[in-house]
Amino acid sequence: MRNLTLLTDLYELTMMQGYFKTDNNRTVIFDAFHRKNPCDGAYAISCGLEQVIDYIKNLHFTEDDIAYLRSLSIFDEDFLEYLSNFHFTGDIYAIPEGTVIFPREPIVKIIAPIMEAQLVETAILNIINHQSLIATKAARVCYAAKGDGIMEFGLRRAQGPDAGIYGARAAVIAGCVGTSNVLTGQMFGVPVKGTHAHSWIMSFPDEYTAFKTYADLYPDACILLVDTYDTLRSGVPNAIRVFKEMREKGIDLKGYGIRLDSGDLAYLTKKARKMLDDAGFEDAIISASSDLDEYLIDSLKTQGAAITSWGVGTNLITSKDNPAFGGVYKLAAVMGDDGTFIPKIKLSENSEKITNPGNKTVYRVYDADGMIKADLIALADETYDESQPLLLFDPVETWKKTLMEPGEYSMREIMVKVFDKGECVYDSPNVMDIQKYCKQEQATLWDESKRLINPQVVHVDLSQKLYDLKQELLHNYGREKL
């Protein structure tokens, strides 16, 4: 477990010293949330909570940390002494990993003294933003493949080792069947996948010898890369020759097939499929890679490409077309002298950047078929009775309303307590269990909300009490109703 305490922006520490010097360490509430889904999609996938937990558990300043901060000539000795005994004492609530999430709802909620809550901002956003981005991208890629296996192959193109390790973790959570990243496999117990490179073929006197040698070594996982020289005139015929020889030796062919990494994948795979089928290898896998993303996979599926397994690298591990997840961390409440929270709101000329005040939680509302109808952000002390009608309304265009009668809906609170007074009270599931949960979550989204282009938006509504509180604060600040 690494100590990432100094993985923070300098201004978090200068603000901490300011709070320390002014004796202002009252308890506050911060919300981490995102304003816009990646890739113009209708949803995102929450990911990274396990690493947030590890970070908080190991949060402390070492002697070397203190010495470095002292060398900056910014911090006074009394503040450095405070840091030398620092540990997290607050509460954390979060939406579990693998959950489908939507804009403006809290993903992580911190309730802690302001110096503690301020310090952890940067690292929490760094972890959640990265893994939620890659998980969301992977979910889109898996959806485009329509049930075919997606393998994460992006390590060499990731923006550094950590991005490769944790990006692969996020990709598997969102639905990838495995990763080429061996260290991720070791760390998180996820399946590792791989075949061979063009260099393997080129290192032998000829393609057939390369294929035969590989098949002799790995008869139970014999996927042969057929595009080193000429896919249809050399690669596929040589692969078929090797498969025939394996069958003649009595080898029970399983997990075998070919991979293409270049060329017109729709044309080549259809031709290769016919060649394999005509030779009696109808169950041979055809795998493809070559700068794939969800849009190209969708196009290839539409064209009838004979691909059943996909290796996706650069465009997945970097989320190349949308390389950042816009998570933010905003103050929602400050504890007053009487021990109650005073709600706070951040104003903006852009209405979507006006925050939701107070101590909040999130409820998921399902229709009678178990599909997501909406999410409802409510104040933490609110409760709901499913035997009563539920009124949902758009928090901006308030005339848009839906009344759900008992029996037409169900609800569940999707935030869970993770830390209580600095102690972790949450057991993180293993990655494959999170993947199973994530698949169940995605199954509650309508296909219209999962489509790649112009998806149907899932509404995130406010409870009446939260809406009224927000309007009251806006009125107090002289703003018109929003």
Annotated model-derived regions:
Residues 67-68, 136-140, 154, 450-457:
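Short coil/turn segments at secondary-structure boundaries
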Residues 92-98, 411-414:
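Short acidic, Pro/Gly- and aromatic-enriched capping/linker segments at domain boundaries
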Residues 28-84:
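N-terminal, Lys/Arg-enriched amphipathic/low-complexity engagement segments
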Residues 149-152, 191-194, 221-224, 256-257, ...:
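Structural motif
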